[in-house]
Amino acid sequence: MHEAKKYLENNQSTGLQIQETQLETPFIKCSGGNLCTEIVQGKFTHFVSRKAMDIDGLGQEILQALIKKGFIKDFADIYVLENHRQDLESLERFGQKSVQNLLKSITQSSSIDLYKFIYSLGIEEVGETTARNLANQFGSFDALKESSFEDLIKVQDIGPRVASKITDY
């Protein structure tokens, strides 16, 4: 619970409400959504992680700097970072070679398995297994986007709660 206390203290300055929730294990959740810098940072960190889009060179510090400078506001912004090449090269510990490697890694991440993309979105309750099941069932992201609540609950391991999280996303 020490980390929870630290998180609460860090969020007091935002004036956002902190909710305590009890599921299988207790955790806290900021109600600020995309207004909460920790939530935004966490979403991007998850998106670029090895199990998701697997983008090398976009660690927490770099992500934080890019978010702070306004270069990244949503996931799609990562794929136009080429437009900020000079700005990227001016970041601390980020020279031409680092930027070149990062942009190459971003390009490579454009052709990953569908389940990894679904997982990368960070939809609440959708882990790797559920993402695989969704990819196997629907075959394309467009088909998943067009799916109904009823279609979703037919997928292996997806019940009403998870189906609601997906449709709400």
Report residues per predicted region.
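Accessory alpha-helical DNA-binding modules that contact the DNA backbone or grooves
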Residues: 1-169
